[in-house]
Every structure is written in structure tokens, then in C-alpha cells.
UniProtKB/Swiss-Prot annotation:
Keywords: Cytoplasm, Magnesium, Metal-binding, Nucleotidyltransferase, RNA-binding, Transferase. The keyword Disulfide bond does not apply. Gene3D superfamilies: GHMP Kinase, N-terminal domain, K Homology domain, type 1, Nucleic acid-binding proteins. Involved in mRNA degradation. Catalyzes the phosphorolysis of single-stranded polyribonucleotides processively in the 3'- to 5'-direction. HAMAP family: PNPase (MF_01595). This is Polyribonucleotide nucleotidyltransferase. Mg(2+) binds at D489, D495. Residues 625-693 form the S1 motif domain. It catalyses: RNA(n+1) + phosphate = RNA(n) + a ribonucleoside 5'-diphosphate. Residues 691-724 are annotated as: Disordered. GO terms for biological process: mRNA catabolic process; RNA processing.
Length: 724
């Protein structure tokens, strides 16, 4: 019944299995893959014909995690998987990016890749396995895919690279890098690093490339046994159409691409395209054969690319007049918004990001439910890209895949530089509002995030900057571009984003639109990016060089204290009664952890102090000889009862009210008076004895200790005089 084909190999100390012929047989390609006990199913279906009028390649990649894969039931009311999580969106992009450039030019058939996680051993992350399985399914499917590709994760522990580190091993790694590519070249890199050098990063990329070659060979062996017949596909020859369009509009397009200002350039390019469109419309009106509008648009795009690319390769001059290494003018400003905890406006050429940092408490942490379990995230970074940023109208609403991906890249760049949570116990939310975009808005977000966090008083280990690099490659000739424009991104061959500090790289993302690039090109790009990053950090330092000494005026203050674990129940109280009363009366937010750590937060220092004193009064005992603030709660003939140390009450005997003789207690104090008392001890019945006369009521100084100190000093003086 089943025609099963299977390939196995030992890869990084674990067995990788690729199998086809048993599951999802009606898909064009289907591969059941496992690594350790993590298992995925990848399927590919591609339409037989493109939709009429289709002018782009409609590739969709859906990565989905099923909670049964980890033996869990989904949370929530409906108890089934819902909209894609951030992780699912990011892995979908991770798979999409290296496979997209390998489809044949001109192929426009609707194509869907679906990868489903069926089992997760909680050791091996399914993302790389999913990429490998998708590559294998595409290779078997018969669609015009110029693969296969391989992929690998690389860690860096103790100055050594680690192939496919487990989830636990990654916790000790200074690097989390995923690389994908063909047997000849690298196509995609995604990474987070702890200030590693460019040499280490490049070494990691090439280490991963070498070690996924056996995977590519296994996919080829599987394809030799089980691949479907290649689909017939012949790209349309547009050479005659291109010659005509060159005749009509090449001169106008060349002139347009010498205009440095984006909007003016777009208007000139639009005018040239309109001229072409009108020419072919007139042909149709005259009854002559006219090409399809989508073919005209495709040829025009190719002509634009050639004009821009050869101007750079031949003359070293870019669209806006810069040479290949120059970064656009930068303006950095902080403290832009009056009520925000931290804010920055970062402008680089025609790209601008308004970035706002907000500090919160443990209650504000994001609860994340993943296959690995549930946890809380205290650093959130949200990237918004409204249509007005590029002078267009468009959809507004929940973030798309691109916004989620760009936000996560900026998150990776900043995350290694955050202070340890126990040193800075705040929840951090950063929002980047892209106000203008002409290339590299994600790297503007990195720069703005660094500035806004420092403006909020967050003690980053070092400022972080990011830069986007581009590539123009024709045969053996290439040019690496620093700080690319949007047009250079669209018309170029690479989008290579590098973020880091003066000391090293913290994040690296690379997407290639051609069949891959070599180690030499990556080496040039990394070196050029390092110079650009240093320049940007210098420009940022004109606004702020390090975190402000104090938190923002409107930010909450957090104090941390610790109590014995067996006292937690008393602080919380029956049904939370006690903790609710403390919060209500003091106005502070209180978070109690299982180990007895308590975080008290409020914008008011008095509120925090009151909450701390209240908790101390429950969880600990007052110390004999210590001085406390108190309130007179009752005046009696023989003294006054004073509330102190939270909810503790003690008696100040009439003889302890004042140094002077007191006839009536009410002559010295009355109910509600704020006083300072010293705990002098306990009577035989365990009742607390307090003294007011032992304390200076203005300064809180211990008068008994002061008198003793003066007496001891005088005695030492007498003894010294006698000795003489």
C-alpha cells in the first residue's frame, strides 16, 4: 500500500531521519522528518497553472506547532490551537527566506508549504528540522525549485562552535545562529550573539555551512529514489519587449535615478513608466497586438534594476549620490515625549523611528505558552510600520509577519546588552513607530531602542547600533553597499543587517535574493558594517553616551526585599486579604515570588517605604535597641500606646515620655501624634516596652547611644591625661 523511501544519517550526535511515501500522499511533496524525538511533517502543494493576471510569485509558508507534540492541551476557553504565535510566525519566515530565491524566475503558480510539528522532545528545537524537511519536500515535488538547501544551528561555548546545540546547551552559549544555504553558497543567516567579533560570526556561518552538507546529500539521495517528474516550465522570452521599452523609457529612467530625493525620484520614475504604459495602450487602441500589463511591469522592473546596478558597479555612485561606504546623515534626539519614561527620535536620511520605552513591574510581564512550557518575558519590543511612513494608504491593525520579524530582530540586537533581571527588576516594553522609511527601518529601531532605554535610565551594558548592508553582484564583479536605501534593497541582491556595540556583534540577519554568496563577500560586508556601526554609534553619542543616573520622572520605582519562605503565607493572608489591604492602603504594587523575593513598585517613594515597613512588621520581629517611626494610638494615665513597625503596638511608660518630669501623659502626646521610639525591651509578660526620651524627636538620633559615646570619649581623655 505504501511506497516508503527513507534516508538516515548521524548528524551532530543525533539521528536525522527523512521519510516519504507514507503520509500526506496527495500533496505534491511530503516528508516526515525526525531529529532525536522531535518530529515534523512538511508538505508542498503548487497549483498547475498561475492565476490570470498574476504578477508575483505567491509563495506561502505555514509553520504550525500542535500542543499534543509536547503532551499538552492548549490553554484558553476553546482548548484548540488558534492564531499563529510569534514563534510560529518567525519560523515560517525562517523557512521562507532561503527557499524563495531558489524558485525559477517567472514561476508564478500558487505554492504553499505547510510544516506541522508532530512531536517535540524538549531538547531539539523543531525550527531547523522544519527547514530541512521543507527543502526535502520541495525537492521531491517536481516544482521548479533549484535546491535542495540545508540548514543548521550553531552555538559557541568555551571558544568552540557547537553543531545543533540543544535547548539546554543554548543557555550557556554566547551565540544562537541559524544558517541555511545550498551546497555552494549561503542564502540566509539569523542570529543573536553576546558581543562576538566579526571573525567569530563569519566562522560560525561557514561552520554551519560545512556541517549541513551531509543533509543536502541525504536529500539528493532521497530525491533520486522518490522525486516526481519535473514539471514542464519555460520562462517567457521578453527580449523583444525589453528592447522596445529601452527605446521608449531608458533615458528617462536613467535621469530619474539620478534624483536624490525619494519622492521626487518616485514621481520621475512613475512618469517614465506612464509613458511606456500609454504607448502600449495606444497600440491596443490602434488594433495592434499589445503585451500584457504584467509583462510590461516585470520588464520595467528588470530594466530599473540594471540601470541602478551598473551605475554602482561602473561608477561607484548610488541612487542618492553617495559612494558605497557612506552612511546617510544622522540626527539623534532623546527625551522627545514629556510623560514617557524614555523616548528617542532617530533619523537617518529619509528613515525615521520614534522609539518609546516604558518601565513596568512583574505584573506587566508577558505570559508565553510554548511547547517547551510556560514562562514570562520581561523584555518586549514592538515594531509598527504604518503606511504613511512610505507616503501611502493601507491597512492598519494587528501586526503582519514583516512587523513581527523586524521587531524580533531588534529584540535580538538589544537583548544581550540588558542588565540582569535581579539587578534591574523592571519589565521593559519598547515600541518603535516608523514615521518615515527609505531603507533599514529595523536598524533605525535598534538605534532608537538603545537611546530610549538609556533615556529611561535602563543601565545597558553598552549602546547598540545597527546598519543594513546591500550587495550588487554581476558575474565576478560585486559592490557591498553600506546603509542601503529602500530601492537598493528591492533592486539589489542582498539585505545584510548587522547590529552590535563597539566591542562586537549582537545580532546578524542576512537574506540573499540570488543563488547565494561566498565567504569572501560576507567578509567584506562584515568589515564594512563594522566601520559603519562605529560611525553610527559616534553619531548616537551626541545625544546620549550612557544610561541616565536616575529613572524617568514618571517611571515606577521598584525595591526588592526578601522574607523567609514560611512567612509568605502570612504576608498574603487568607484568600489574599492581607496583601490586598497592603496594596490598597499604600498604593504600591507588590509581587511575591516562591523563594520569598518581594518586589514593591510605585512612583512614590513614601508608598514603597510604607509597604516595606508593613511587610517587615508581618514577616520579621522588631530589634531591641532599634529606633522606629510610630503613631500614638491611645493615651492613658500611665503613658501612651504607640503603633510602630507596621502593625506592632508598644507602651511608652509615662517615665519614658520625656527627660523632664511628666505629670500627665496628655501634656506630652495626644492620639495621632507622629513620634520616634526606641525599642528598649519586653516585660515579663512579653509586652513591648518603648522609650521616647531616648530618641531626639527631631533628628531621630539615639540619645542614650550618644551619651554613652561622649562618656567613653571623656574617659579615654582622662586616662590619656593621667598617663602623661
Amino acid at each position: 500500500m505504501f511506497d516508503i523511501h527513507r534516508e538516515e544519517l548521524d548528524w551532530g550526535g543525533r539521528t536525522l531521519v527523512l521519510e516519504t511515501g507514507k503520509m500526506a500522499r496527495q500533496a505534491d511533496g511530503a516528508v516526515f522528518a525526525s531529529y532525536g524525538d522531535t518530529t515534523v511533517l512538511a508538505t508542498v502543494v503548487s497549483a498547475r497553472e498561475p492565476k490570470p493576471g498574476q504578477d508575483f510569485f505567491p509563495l506561502t509558508v505555514n509553520y504550525q506547532e500542535k500542543t499534543y507534540a509536547a503532551g499538552r492541551i492548549p490553554g484558553g476557553y476553546f482548548k484548540r490551537e488558534g492564531r499563529p504565535s510569534e514563534k510560529e510566525t518567525l519560523v515560517s519566515r525562517l523557512i521562507d527566506r532561503p527557499i524563495r530565491p531558489l524558485f525559477a524566475d517567472g514561476y508564478k503558480n500558487d505554492t504553499q508549504v505547510v510544516v506541522t510539528v508532530l512531536a517535540h522532545d524538549l531538547e531539539n528545537d523543531p525550527d531547523v528540522l522544519s527547514m530541512v524537511a521543507a527543502s526535502a519536500a520541495l525537492t521531491l515535488s517536481g516544482v521548479p525549485f533549484m535546491g535542495p538547501i540545508g540548514g543548521a544551528r550553531v552555538g559557541f561555548v568555551g571558544d568552540e562552535y557547537v553543531l545543533n546545540p540543544t535547548i539546554e546547551e543554548l543557555k550557556d552559549s554566547a551565540l544562537d545562529l541559524v544558517v541555511a544555504g545550498t551546497s555552494d553558497a549561503v542564502l540566509m543567516v539569523e542570529s543573536e550573539a553576546k558581543e562576538l567579533s566579526e571573525e567569530v560570526m563569519l566562522g560560525a556561518v561557514m561552520f554551519g555551512h560545512r556541517h549541513f552538507q551531509p543533509v543536502i546529500e541525504a536529500i539528493i539521495r532521497l530525491a533520486e529514489k522518490a522525486a516526481k517528474e519535473p514539471r514542464p516550465f519555460e520562462p517567457v522570452d521578453h527580449s523583444a519587449l525589453e528592447a522596445k521599452i529601452r527605446e521608449i523609457a531608458e533615458a528617462d529612467l536613467r535621469a530619474a535615478y539620478k534624483i536624490k530625493q525619494k519622492q521626487a525620484r518616485y514621481e520621475a520614475v512613475g512618469a517614465a513608466k506612464s509613458k511606456v504604459k500609454k504607448y502600449f495602450e495606444q497600440l491596443a487602441i490602434d488594433g495592434q497586438e499589445a503585451p500584457k500589463a504584467q509583462d510590461v511591469a516585470e520588464v520595467l522592473k528588470g530594466l530599473e534594476a540594471k540601470i541602478v546596478r551598473w551605475a554602482i558597479l561602473d561608477d561607484g555612485i548610488r541612487i542618492d549620490g553617495r559612494d558605497v561606504k557612506t552612511v546617510r546623515p544622522i540626527v539623534s534626539e532623546v527625551g522627545i515625549l514629556p510623560r514617557a519614561h524614555g523616548s528617542a527620535l532617530f533619523t537617518r536620511g529619509e528613515t525615521q523611528a520614534l522609539v518609546v520605552a516604558t518601565l513596568g513591574t512583574g505584573e506587566d510581564e508577558q505570559f508565553i505558552d510554548s511547547l517547551e512550557g510556560t514562562y514570562k518575558e520581561h523584555f518586549l519590543l514592538h515594531y509598527n510600520f504604518p503606511p504613511f511612513s512610505v507616503g501611502e494608504t493601507g491597512r492598519m491593525g494587528s501586526p503582519g509577519r514583516r512587523e513581527i520579524g523586524h521587531g524580533k530582530l531588534a529584540w535580538r540586537a538589544i537583548h544581550p546588552m540588558l542588565p540582569a533581571k535581579h539587578e534591574f527588576p523592571y519589565t521593559l516594553r519598547v515600541v518603535s513607530e516608523i514615521l518615515e522609511s527609505n531603507g533599514s527601518s529595523s536598524m533605525a529601531t535598534v538605534c532608537g531602542t538603545s537611546l530610549s532605554l538609556m533615556d529611561a535610565g535602563v543601565p545597558l551594558k553598552s549602546p547598540v547600533a545597527g546598519i543594513a548592508m546591500g550587495l550588487i553582484l554581476e558575474g565576478e564583479k560585486f559592490a557591498v553597499l553600506s546603509d542601503i536605501l529602500g530601492d537598493e534593497d528591492h533592486l539589489g541582491d542582498m539585505d545584510f543587517k548587522v547590529a552590535g556595540t563597539e566591542s562586537g556583534v549582537t545580532a546578524l540577519q542576512m537574506d540573499i535574493k540570488i543563488a547565494g554568496i561566498t565567504e569572501e563577500i560576507m567578509k567584506v560586508a562584515l568589515a564594512q558594517a563594522k566601520d559603519g556601526r562605529a560611525h553610527i554609534l559616534g553619531e548616537m553619542s551626541k545625544a546620549l553616551t550612557s544610561a541616565r543616573a536616575e529613572l524617568g520622572e514618571h517611571a515606577p520605582r521598584i525595591e526588592v526585599m526578601k522574607i523567609a519562605v514560611d512567612k509568605i503565607r502570612e504576608v498574603i493572608g487568607s484568600g489574599g486579604k492581607v496583601i490586598r489591604e497592603i496594596v490598597e492602603k499604600t498604593g504600591a504594587k507588590i509581587n511575591i515570588e516562591d523563594d520569598g523575593t518581594i518586589k514593591i513598585a510605585s512612583a512614590s517613594g513614601d508608598s514603597i517605604k510604607a509597604a516595606i515597613n508593613w511587610i517587615k512588621s508581618i514577616a520579621s520581629e522588631p530589634e531591641v535597641g532599634a529606633i522606629y517611626d510610630g503613631t500614638v494610638v491611645k493615651v492613658v494615665d500611665f503613658g501612651a500606646f504607640v503603633n510602630f513597625f507596621g502593625s506592632k503596638d508598644g507602651l511608652v511608660h509615662i517615665s519614658q515620655l520625656s527627660k523632664e518630669r511628666v505629670a500627665k501623659s496628655s501634656d506630652v502626646v495626644k492620639e495621632g501624634d507622629k513620634v520616634k521610639v526606641k525599642l528598649v525591651g519586653f516585660d515579663e509578660r512579653g509586652k513591648t516596652r518603648l522609650s521616647m526620651k531616648a530618641v531626639d524627636q527631631t533628628t531621630g538620633e539615639d540619645l542614650e547611644a550618644k551619651a554613652k559615646s561622649e562618656k567613653d570619649a571623656a574617659k579615654e581623655g582622662d586616662e590619656a591625661g593621667a598617663a602623661e
